[in-house]
Amino acid sequence: MSTEVSPLQSNAYAVNVKTGKRRLIGNKDGMHHVQLSGSGNYVIDNYTSFTIPRNIEIVPTSGKEKTVSLLTATNPMEAYNMPEITVGTLKAADGKTDLYYRLIKPVNFDPNKKYPAVVYVYGGPHAQLIHNNRNYDARGWDIYMAQLGYVMLTVDNRGSDNRGLEFENCTFRQLGTEEMKDQVKGVDFLKSLGYVDNNRIGVHGWSFGGFMTTNLMLTYPELFKVGVAGGLSSTGLTTK
């Protein structure tokens, strides 16, 4: 499995151990979860993307036979009034690293209105909140808040998963510092949007995200109207 196509994806490859050449197996789009057959000749490829609710296919590893479809799911949210969900990049606090963000606009969005905003944060190691999955991994709560009229922003800051060792190791011996700087860049991005009410920006997270919420509120109180910290991590990870 590899993130070669995009850090937001997981794709399967076949590798020739003699030549080192590799070949993509299956659809290029989306997050793929594969199971290899005992013979090694096929994989069951279970995948989703922002535009694909779910496909399950039998894919030959040789690349010479046809793929067989087992399931093509319909969009379960098709009948609902869904918010606009987009993914983009912004620069990290180091001025050079691209960070991925997910932005959800309120349902029935009016660019002439001013909307309150919530930054949903995790920010810790071994986690990534944004993938090329259905709704870019936005949860039901994110969508519910958009239905209530909130702009929702999530940023995968430096120190989070699937971007390589250098990206994750920037927080070594300074956990909670570099992550906050990147989240502040996310707030700066929010404040640059003409439809966001800069006086009504909140922050919320659970576990390491609860730690980040508390830390952000105490370090940058001028940026946030309110913070809601859930399930704070109280281990040596965040207290030393």
Where are these regions (language model features)?
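Short loop/turn segments that connect beta-strands within beta-propeller blades
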Residues: 16-20, 61-63
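Surface loop/turn motifs at the tips and blade-to-blade linkers of beta-strand repeat domains
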Residues: 25-29
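Repetitive beta-architecture junctions, highlighting loop-to-beta-strand starts
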Residues: 8-12, 20, 54, 99
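Serine-hydrolase catalytic core recognition
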Residues: 31-240
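Short glycine/acidic-enriched loop and turn motifs that connect beta-strands
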Residues: 3-7, 49-52
